[in-house]
Amino acid sequence: MIKKKSHSGLKKRIKITKKKKLLRGHAYKNHLAASKTTKQNRQLRGVVCVDHSDYKRIKTLIRGL
């Protein structure tokens, strides 16, 4: 039987907390920051917990959750 592997791209983008929550960064902040407002750039900083509906989908891609 083939070993099931975790999605390596997803492993680099998500951090798993001690209580099995998934943290992710915001989208839309790689470039073109000058055209966005200061408020937009400030709100895109930091990390956010993954939504519960997405958690079920992501759980299948990461083994060991």
From Swiss-Prot:
Keyword list, A-Z: Ribonucleoprotein, Ribosomal protein
One GO CC term, this protein: cytosolic large ribosomal subunit
GO biological process: translation
Highest taxon above the source species: Bacteria
SUPFAM superfamilies reported in the protein's UniProt record: L35p-like
Gene3D superfamilies documented for this protein: 4.10.410.60
Entry-linked Pfam families: Ribosomal_L35p (PF01632)
A GO term for molecular function: structural constituent of ribosome
Keyword Ribosomal protein included in the entry's annotation: yes
Family: Belongs to the bacterial ribosomal protein bL35 family.
Protein name as catalogued: Large ribosomal subunit protein bL35
Annotated source species: Phytoplasma australiense
Originating gene: rpmI
